[in-house]
Amino acid sequence: VGDQKAKEPEYTAVSGTETSVEPTGVISVKRESDNIMMVNYLDLKTSKSDKKDVYFMNALIGLFNENGVAMGNPWQHKIQYKKTYLELDAQFKAESAFEASYHFNINPNLNAEVLKSIRAVVERPELWTVSINGNEVSKTEGRYWIDKSFPEFAVGQFLKPGKNTLTLKAPRMHVLAEVMPVYFIGDFLVKPAKQGFEITDGNISTLGSWREAGLPFYSQKVAYSQTYKVTKADGTAFKVKLSKWNGSVAEVLVNG
């Protein structure tokens, strides 16, 4: 005999017996994690070329091509046999050094304290030095986004309203040097700019599209709270209907 509890029967509505309950007060909308902005275009400078505003994947493939790897990024093609790909690293010389610069904009309306609290996320920091507006920064020990391969960098003190630049400098090409997007995390909104997106002040406050509200790259939770006054009688059941809702999972909590 197991200790599994018997499932309660599913509620089946009887036509004509449902009554809509109107909310009281204004709905509360709150983002439960820091927002994020991705920057996936960059300038790439090597001893052989100087490319501007390149999509990261094109920059990555071109970087391998320039250094004698005709297939481009080997890790995108097939599973490595023995150490075939790792052994490619021996062919990269000192003159294969490169510099990748990511430009992004911060709206002057951003609160100064929020600006200082912004962090950057850069993959594989052991392969290059990271600098923000010319100031070299190191990863914050024990702080990472998603997993430990995405360490955080405290860059807020070096940021400024307007154009900013995060730069990666590699002393030489490396077989693991996949030039990927960089990310910025903080309590801000992300809005379309003349080119790409920019970090702006504000908080999500209404129902509707996250993308249009300033969360185009956000993938965590948003809490929506609404008050209802109801009278519970014997035999009464309550149903929550999410109209025009697009999402992965919705969790409903009653009184916390």
What does each model-identified segment do?
Residues 6-93, 124, 139-148, 153-227, ...:
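An acidic-aromatic loop/edge-strand motif
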Residues 84-96, 100-109:
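Regulatory/sensor and coupling segments of signal-transduction and defense proteins
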Residues 1-5, 248:
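Carbohydrate-binding surface patches
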Residues 103-134, 166, 228-256:
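Aromatic-lined ligand-binding clefts that engage carbohydrates, nucleic acids, or primary amines
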